[in-house]
């Protein structure tokens, strides 16, 4: 981790990312890994959270730190394809209204999902967790999971703690049907920096 922070070639505070190759087959439903983890030190990014919920939830959402809060008027923003947020939280009863925007939100990873905690009856809690550093991760078609675990300025210790929290979460998602090796390789990179292979133990 220290090596990653020291080899960053850029002048700005680069992001540090972890890339884990898994021994899963993402085409199998029970091996399509998708979950969330609360990083103890956050990601270092200012996350903009939008809330689509009944007006009765708006005050609590605002108090929790939501940046954009809307009822029906929020849909007009989506009609214009204005996506000025990083995470979208919605209540279960409002999810059907987002169905027609699946093609807009889905490919960008913005569609609320119960697995990621963004379809929630407790909107304020979902907003607080998102702001505090709760992030979603999922395996891609190549069976690799990518996650930003902070900034170079965090230092090796905090980055390692974030990485360990992620690995613990990832290990808890190991499919019971998997017979072979679960975590095949781990690499750490910074923005524009080299990929550094690390031992699974970090």
Regions inferred by a protein language model and the residue ranges of each:
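Glycine-rich phosphate-binding loops that contact phosphosugars or nucleotide phosphates
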Residues: 60-67
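Long, charge-patterned amphipathic alpha-helical coiled-coil/hairpin "stalk" segments used as oligomerization
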Residues: 67-171
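Flexible glycine-/small-residue-rich
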Residues: 20-22, 53, 91-92, 149-151, ...
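Residue-level signature of catalytic and energy-coupling elements of molecular machines
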Residues: 1, 61, 106, 188
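Flexible, glycine/charged-enriched surface loops at secondary-structure junctions
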Residues: 12-16, 173-185
């Amino acid at each position: 981790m220290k090596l990653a922070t020291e080899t960053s070639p850029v002048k700005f505070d680069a992001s540090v990312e972890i890339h884990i190759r898994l021994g899963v087959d993402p085409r199998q439903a029970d091996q399509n890994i998708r979950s969330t983890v609360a990083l103890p030190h956050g990601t270092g990014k200012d996350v903009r959270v939008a809330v689509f919920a009944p007006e009765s939830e708006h005050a609590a959402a605002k108090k929790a730190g939501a940046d954009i809060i809307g009822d029906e008027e929020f849909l007009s923003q989506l009609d214009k394809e204005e996506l000025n947020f990083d995470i979208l939280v919605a209540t279960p009863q409002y999810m059907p209204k987002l169905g027609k925007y699946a093609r807009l939100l889905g490919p960008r990873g913005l569609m609320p999902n119960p697995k990621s905690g963004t379809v929630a009856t407790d909107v304020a809690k979902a907003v607080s967790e998102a702001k505090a550093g709760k992030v979603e991760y999922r395996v891609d078609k190549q069976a690799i999971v990518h996650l930003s675990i902070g900034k170079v300025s965090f230092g090796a210790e905090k980055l390692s703690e974030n990485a360990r929290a992620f690995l613990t979460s990832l290990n808890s998602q190991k499919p019971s049907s998997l017979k072979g090796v679960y975590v095949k390789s781990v690499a750490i990179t910074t923005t524009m920096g080299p990929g550094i292979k690390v031992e699974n133990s970090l």
